[in-house]
């Protein structure tokens, strides 16, 4: 009896070593946790699957080995959720992968093609990383990968953005490729996309309406591309989209063009202005005059050379603040109103302009036998205001020195009032009529 028990124990002992998979024995080359259902066989220089893996494993790490082919070797692991086969020598994704997969990483291999059969029936897959391979083409089928949320195709050799990408995607990384185009409708179904990485490619433009359906987009990278900023017809859509989107754009292309476009949209030319010049004569005041102190306002009248007038003296002191409506054009006077002008600033980007007329003084004038003209300086100081909704714009100042020709003589008498001036003019006209009648 004791001999039979001893013999049976010996058989059971041998059975323990011959069937480790049945009795949950971890393969010698691997580290097993979570009741042997999490198996880590990374960095073991493996080229074939180790024996003894349980069929109910849920996590398998085969990274940093020398696998070249895993076709049909993983099908029986029907509970597998996470598979890491990165940093191997695979030339394609393993065929007939279990449909239970949630996460798969095949980065840093030699995969050249992601075919439709590689992802067929992977309805539960949420994360797929095929970065750092040699992919030149990606073929996806509609209604497959319908649970996929993260797709990493960065650092490959793709030249066009893959079509038929699943609609539940949140993150798509296409950086570090050779992408030159996005076919129409490629991104139209990605309404849940939050992050799109397109940097380090060869894009020159983005076709119209390509990004119009990316309603949930939070971040996009566009730097290190070959944007054709000199061809406005190619880049206009992208510039306008960047101005309107709420997403964080990293690496804004054509910064000079988008800056000028922002200024144009932010400060449009008011209706009624057809000229590109911002002129004094074309403006209307929108505020009252703060202060005006005038002894008598002079009026320049052309007088024929053969007539002389009585000696007059007049003076004026102007102190005046007037606010004008502004545009984004430079503030310049009409050419016929000035003989010389100095413009220190060529931009007036604020919402209003305040004009100060200072020291506009005309003095010491009289007529003698020889009429002479001397320039009278009038300083027009223009200071741009700051719009409330544009705090980043620097304040600017424009100064114009206006010179107006005035008929001058020596000062001897004070300036007559307006009524006296009318009397003098009436008397002069009456005398002129008498002379003409006598001559006839």
From Swiss-Prot:
Glycans are attached at residues 45, 61, 103, 152, 176, 189, 192, 234, 364, 389, 425. One of its GO terms (biological process) is cell adhesion. It comes from the Eukaryota. Oligodendrocytes and myelin of the central nervous system. Binds to RTN4R. Keywords: Cell adhesion, Cell membrane, Glycoprotein, GPI-anchor, Leucine-rich repeat, Lipoprotein, Membrane, Repeat, Signal. PANTHER family: OLIGODENDROCYTE-MYELIN GLYCOPROTEIN, PTHR47114. It comes from Homo sapiens (Human). Ser/Thr-rich repeats lie at residues 229-270, 271-292, 293-335, 336-377, 378-416. LRR repeats lie at residues 56-77, 79-100, 101-121, 124-145, 147-168, 169-189, 192-213, 216-239. The lineage of its organism: Eukaryota, Metazoa, Chordata, Craniata, Vertebrata. This is Oligodendrocyte-myelin glycoprotein.
